[in-house]
Amino acid sequence: MKKTLQRGFTLIELLVVIAIIGILAAVVIGSLNDARSGGQNASIQQSMANVRSQAELVYNSSNYSYTSVCTDQRVTDLLQASLDVVNGTGAINATSPAWSTSTPSGRSVACQSLDTEWVAMAPLAAGDGFWCVDSTGFSGATTTDQTFSASNMDCR
């Protein structure tokens, strides 16, 4: 009689391997979501840094006045890009030097400009607050949705 060796895995061994793969996949997917949110925040921060640069270009080309910063097409395009990262939808209709746009998700972008100063704010991803830039050179996170006025034109 000839003995034959049977090689292979039992059903239990296969189920254990599948369970381990599932646990590892859950950990990796959780890390990927954090990385995605961080990438979205970096995109918003860069768009807002570009708003600051564009505001200075508008200032230099508008007889040294910030009044038209919030109605400048390039500024509104950058703010729209920030809004699209968070919401995927929403439209900015900047017809005055002071405006705010809310979206169906409740997040908003705001911009206000006067002759000597300006401020803009956009929401960060995943409800992490807002990123605000202003004419004083400040660029940073704020935790609340601020209302800007002629007497309150900075992010701090």
Predicted regions and their residues:
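Aromatic side chains
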Residues: 9, 59, 66-70, 118, ...
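N-terminal single-pass transmembrane signal-anchor helix
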Residues: 2-32, 36
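A generic fold-level signal
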Residues: 6, 43, 112-115
